[in-house]
Amino acid sequence: MNVKMLHHVCIQTEKYEESLKFYTEILEFELVKTAVNFHKRDFNTWLRLGTFMIELQTAKKGDKLKDWSSLNEGIVHMCFLVDSVQVEFEKIEKLGYTNFKIKNGEKIYKVEDGYLFKIKAPEGTEIEIRDMLI
């Protein structure tokens, strides 16, 4: 397969307004396009950060989404590489977002040759922010 890039990840949510605010205001994604009443969904929205996109959508009318769990098969979290974990952590904290994952009593923790922290989006998606490639 000759892949050019990872195009997008689709995230479904029953907390659309909260999730949209999280991705645009906390993680600084750009809102590209919103479709209303898209294939039986109230909203289907495209968000972009650099070349990476998220398709944020509500459930189809009449469907009830199950809560996120790290025990599900498939993707467990997504990760963004940054220059400084500390700078990004402080920026998110100053914006008032507090849903950080705690490990060994710490919000930021050392792994291998760098640092990382994890936050939970309103719909449950776990997002890792790290400052080293592997």
Regions found by a protein language model. Give the residues of each.
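N-terminal beta-strand motif that seeds the catalytic metal site of vicinal oxygen chelate
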Residues: M1-E18, I75-F80, D131-I134
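Short, charged/polar surface micro-motifs in flexible loops or helix N-caps
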Residues: G50-I54, K61-D63, D83-Q86
